[in-house]
Amino acid sequence: MSNSAKLIDVITKVALPIGIIASGIQYSMYDVKGGSRGVIFDRINGVKQQVVGEGTHFLVPWLQKAIIYDVRTKPKSIATNTGTKDLQMVSLTLRVLHRPEVLQLPAIYQNLGLDYDERVLPSIGNEVLKSIVAQFDAAELITQREIISQKIRKELSTRANEFGIKLEDVSITHMTFGPEFTKAVEQKQIAQQDAERAKFLVEKAEQERQASVIRAEGEAESAEFISKALAKVGDGLLLIRRLEASKDIAQTLANSSNVVYLPSQHSGGGNSESSGSPNSLLLNIGR
């Protein structure tokens, strides 16, 4: 046998075992990255109940397989259309922050698989939403939104725990009502505005009525005062009022450019009350 043939034979005998060993080592090692956990499936014994932490680990190639789960908190949106207590349709969207319970990962893999969240959350989310929304009227969904969110969070967390899922937060991110309810709300707002306007008009009329009463009372008191004054002084008060009125009229006529003042001319045998004195003229005007 030649030297080259011997060399090839030696390399084959050495390299083959080394290759098999290297391949076995490669397939027997696996890494669990940060924020992840591993579950081991054994072809003989099934899913092991021990959860594998972060780092590099070994398994038996072909007989065992590592299933890696992301255990960090992830968001999930759940949308549904449902009816309220007063038979109004409403569209709701929930944002759910969830993660798997680490110790429940073997059971989650056995019962649900890797897509556990897609299998569970939409189903129980719709169930809880329909159940709770049906307990409230459409208007209460708006006025008691925080209370409803708390009830949804509590009920949904309880249901999710049954499947090994931990909910970090649940909140309503979107809420829309049907056109009938929207129209009813608009009509209610218009009715409230009309009621406020009518109330304002009633209050204004009442204020005007009270003002009229006060004004009438004042006029009555003034008339009573004048009557008492007349009873005490007789016609003297009327004469003073006539003089004041005559003075105002004379002043107005004097200031007018279109009026010419002509003194009165009377015969000597005329009535003394009709004499041409200015005072007599003013008194006659006042009368």
UniProtKB/Swiss-Prot annotation:
* UniProt keyword annotations, A-Z: Coiled coil, Membrane, Mitochondrion, Mitochondrion inner membrane
Q: What's the stated role of this polypeptide?
A: Prohibitin probably acts as a holdase/unfoldase for the stabilization of newly synthesized mitochondrial proteins. Involved in mitophagy; may act as an adapter for ATG8 that supports mitophagosome assembly. Negatively regulates the proteolytic processing of ATG32 via the i-AAA protease. Acts as a negative regulator of the m-AAA protease.
Lineage of origin: Eukaryota, Fungi, Dikarya, Ascomycota, Saccharomycotina
| Broad class of where this protein is predominantly found | mitochondrion
What this protein is called in its record is: Prohibitin-1
- Name any Gene Ontology BP term: protein stabilization
User: Which SUPFAM superfamilies has this protein been placed in?
Assistant: Band 7/SPFH domain
Record keywords: Iron-sulfur included?
no
What post-translational modification information does the record give? The N-terminus is blocked.
- Taxonomic source organism: Saccharomyces cerevisiae (strain ATCC 204508 / S288c)
Q: Which residues form the signal peptide?
A: none
Question: Could you tell me which residues belong to the region Interaction with ATG8?
Answer: 102-116
Q: Which family does it belong to?
A: Belongs to the prohibitin family.
From the UniProt record, list the coiled-coil ranges: 180-224
* Residues covered by region (Disordered): 264-287
Gene Ontology, cellular component aspect: mitochondrial inner membrane; mitochondrial prohibitin complex; mitochondrion
Phenotype of null mutants: Impairs mitophagy; decreases interaction between ATG11 and ATG32.
Which Pfam family, just one, is annotated for this protein?
Answer: Band_7
The protein's assembly and partners: The mitochondrial prohibitin complex consists of two subunits (PHB1 and PHB2). The subunits assemble into a membrane-associated ring-shaped supercomplex of approximately 1 mDa. The mitochondrial prohibitin complex interacts with the m-AAA protease, a heterohexamer composed of YTA12/RCA1 and YTA10/AFG3. The mitochondrial prohibitin complex interacts with ATG8 and the interaction may support mitophagosome assembly.
At the top level, the lineage of the source is Eukaryota
Q: AIM: where is this motif?
A: 109-112
Q: Where in the cell is it found?
A: Mitochondrion inner membrane
